[in-house]
Regions:
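Short, amphipathic alpha-helical interaction segments positioned at domain boundaries
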Residues: 64-95
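Short amphipathic alpha-helical interaction segments
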Residues: 33-50, 66-67
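Short amphipathic alpha-helical interface segments
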Residues: 2-32
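Hydrophobic, helix-forming membrane-interacting segments
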Residues: 90-128
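A short, conserved structural fragment
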Residues: 48-59
Length: 144
């Protein structure tokens, strides 16, 4: 089965929105957009394997698999923060679509580069702010 990056993003957004402290969601009872239950189950399993979510995976006697999701991990939050913005996500998808296979780690790195490019573009509109950002990045604390 192929991992659907849109399903990954939508599931992470759903987990962040719906799962509170001391709560969980069962992937079997989760419905998101146009994704099949198999897509959601496969995505949840892969996110758990990758360390992006805290989940309990149970192999049931009838041969089915149950996944209870308790939270995003620190890495899950970092990944979601990189791909949350719709404009960033759209640009990231257009870049990675040019390749036949791209890991979630690469998707996250591309999204981070897209964000940095957008920040750099914004900083270019304010030269003084750009100078301060550059100097502080070099470790210079005497900006003023």
């Amino acid at each position: 089965m192929r991992l659907n990056n849109d399903c990954v993003r939508d599931l992470l957004l759903t987990i962040e929105e719906e799962v509170g402290i001391d709560e969980y969601i069962s992937i079997e009872n989760t419905q998101i957009k146009d994704y099949s239950s198999d897509d959601l189950l496969y995505t949840a399993l892969k996110l758990q394997e990758a360390g992006y979510i805290n989940a309990k995976v149970t192999n049931c006697l009838d041969g089915s698999v149950s996944v209870d999701i308790f939270s995003l991990t620190w890495d899950g939050h970092k990944f979601l923060d990189n791909i949350r913005d719709n404009e960033v996500w759209s640009k990231t998808k257009s870049i990675v679509a040019k390749f036949s296979s791209v890991s979630l780690g690469i998707v996250s790195n591309v999204a981070a580069q897209v964000i940095l490019a957008m920040i750099k573009q914004q900083l270019g509109q304010w030269p003084l702010l750009s100078f301060c950002f550059y100097d502080s990045w070099k470790g210079n604390s005497n900006l003023w």
